[in-house]
UniProtKB/Swiss-Prot annotation:
It comes from the Bacteria. SUPFAM superfamilies: VC0467-like. Signal peptide: none annotated. Residues 1-10 have a biased composition (Basic residues). The lineage of its organism: Bacteria, Pseudomonadati, Pseudomonadota, Alphaproteobacteria, Hyphomicrobiales. Belongs to the UPF0301 (AlgH) family. Residues 1-25 are annotated as: Disordered. This is UPF0301 protein Nham_3550. NCBIfam families: PRK00228.1-1, PRK00228.1-4.
Length: 216
């Protein structure tokens, strides 16, 4: 994880249409992307992604259902010198329950924390939608380790990124479904069931899903 203490490298999208002043509804900030069976990239097969930023300049999101294998949150805190290594590391309950995800294939050495809006760092936390925020500095990990962090949080290593127009094209090609997110699904501990739950959220039976289905 990067040790930088600065604002995350994502920008809040501009929502006003240049001609009418009306909100542009085409962007997907705060939405879930659900991979379709046609998805050929194994890194994203059966993935559920929370879209943190989406604009004409591209998109950025965090995969919610890819555990980072043997990576342990306490070990990461030790590596970052946030806590000292000992035989009996004692963390607050919220930190003990913290899951580490593979957030995506971009900047895999950097950590991104999706969290509830009860925690905010000026000039570092990016509010997204529906009480969900993103922070990518060490300060939030230090707060979590001390029991002073957000009530709900996920630590992701890396993120998923799209070039301008790329995500829109993938959706048109039936690579992704999309639907509104909710904190219960984002922060729920049932990692293995998130894909099925996300599909049920939009009324789709996973067993009936085909490569030809369109986007929601």
């Amino acid at each position: 994880m990067s040790a930088a203490r600065k604002r995350p490298g994502t920008g809040r999208r501009q929502t006003d249409d240049a001609d009418t002043g009306a909100p542009d509804q085409s962007y997907l900030d705060g939405q879930l992307l659900i991979a379709m069976p046609v998805m050929e990239d194994e890194r994203f097969a059966r993935s559920v992604i929370y879209v943190c930023a989406h604009s004409s300049e591209g998109a950025m999101g965090i995969i919610l259902n890819r555990p980072a294998g043997s990576v342990d949150f306490a070990d990461l805190l030790v590596q970052l010198d946030i806590i000292k290594r000992s035989d009996s590391i004692k963390l607050p309950e919220t930190a003990e329950a913290m899951k580490v995800m593979k957030g995506g294939p971009v900047e895999t050495g950097r950590g991104f924390v999706l969290h509830s809006s009860d925690f905010f760092i000026e000039d570092a936390t990016l509010p997204i939608d529906d009480g969900v925020c993103l922070t990518a500095t060490l300060d939030i990990l230090e707060a979590i380790a001390k029991g002073a962090g957000p009530k709900h949080a996920i630590l992701a290593l890396g993120y998923a990124g799209w070039a301008p127009g790329q995500l829109e094209t993938e959706i048109q090609d039936n690579g992704w479904l999309h639907c509104p997110a909710d904190p219960e699904l984002i922060f729920g501990r049932d990692i293995e069931d998130k894909y099925t739950r996300a599909l049920h959220k939009i009324g789709i039976d996973p067993g009936m899903l085909s490569n030809e289905a369109g986007h929601a």
